[in-house]
């Protein structure tokens, strides 16, 4: 019998190496037990940094004593893109990575918010280096994350993303819905990224002489008159999975035929493997 090779997976995020979301992801990956895990993540929160990286000031890299068992863990005084660059170009340049995961983010990264997201920025960087990658984000708050069945789903997402063959490596943007009434998630939907986005309302915090201090953290949803597939999936308690190589994304490299093939492949592979209660229509 041929032994199945374990994947080499890098995990990063933008909430910081001590965040709850990355710990949840490590737990699920360890439960699924199909990969060797390597963490390279920011020491501090880097939300909203998109694909920013340390161009002028040097960044530091040091071993981190992670509380869960992984192959290696490193903390970076920089952005998620810094983490990916250091992982690929320095730490693992002699032993290639199979996949990069970013998350689980505390808050959704759907619609056009993916332009701002440092969670998504990390997987874009991975794709630029020819490595498939998945961004994972929990709507509203990480406390809404439902762990039941997620180890098998995460594994099937990882294996599908690595196995998918195209001119460009696959990048998936996965968002988990916030079920405020604690009802179980209905399943997972392959969607396209929507046009919805969050925008910050400038709020004056204080003034010191002529200097004013503002925050843009007061975020509001802006939606189109016609809701996107992604928006409807999340609103109806489905997990959404949107490719980052389709329309409404910075790298629209898939033709309509290729996109249809990707969707069919996803539904035959990931949806079939995941132990979830799938329904036919969005309610």
Swiss-Prot record:
<dbReference type="GO" id="GO:0004309">
    <property type="term" value="F:exopolyphosphatase activity"/>
</dbReference>
<dbReference type="GO" id="GO:0005737">
    <property type="term" value="C:cytoplasm"/>
</dbReference>
<dbReference type="GO" id="GO:0000166">
    <property type="term" value="F:nucleotide binding"/>
</dbReference>
<protein>
    <recommendedName>
        <fullName>5'-nucleotidase SurE</fullName>
        <ecNumber>3.1.3.5</ecNumber>
    </recommendedName>
</protein>
<keyword id="KW-0378">Hydrolase</keyword>
<dbReference type="InterPro" id="IPR036523">
    <property type="entry name" value="SurE-like_sf"/>
</dbReference>
<dbReference type="Pfam" id="PF01975">
    <property type="entry name" value="SurE"/>
</dbReference>
<dbReference type="GO" id="GO:0008254">
    <property type="term" value="F:3'-nucleotidase activity"/>
</dbReference>
<dbReference type="GO" id="GO:0046872">
    <property type="term" value="F:metal ion binding"/>
</dbReference>
<comment type="function">
    <text>Nucleotidase that shows phosphatase activity on nucleoside 5'-monophosphates.</text>
</comment>
<keyword id="KW-0547">Nucleotide-binding</keyword>
<feature type="binding site">
    <location>
        <position position="47"/>
    </location>
    <ligand>
        <name>a divalent metal cation</name>
    </ligand>
</feature>
<comment type="similarity">
    <text>Belongs to the SurE nucleotidase family.</text>
</comment>
<dbReference type="GO" id="GO:0008253">
    <property type="term" value="F:5'-nucleotidase activity"/>
</dbReference>
<keyword id="KW-0963">Cytoplasm</keyword>
<feature type="binding site">
    <location>
        <position position="105"/>
    </location>
    <ligand>
        <name>a divalent metal cation</name>
    </ligand>
</feature>
<feature type="binding site">
    <location>
        <position position="14"/>
    </location>
    <ligand>
        <name>a divalent metal cation</name>
    </ligand>
</feature>
<keyword id="KW-0479">Metal-binding</keyword>
<dbReference type="InterPro" id="IPR002828">
    <property type="entry name" value="SurE-like_Pase/nucleotidase"/>
</dbReference>
<dbReference type="InterPro" id="IPR030048">
    <property type="entry name" value="SurE"/>
</dbReference>
<feature type="binding site">
    <location>
        <position position="15"/>
    </location>
    <ligand>
        <name>a divalent metal cation</name>
    </ligand>
</feature>
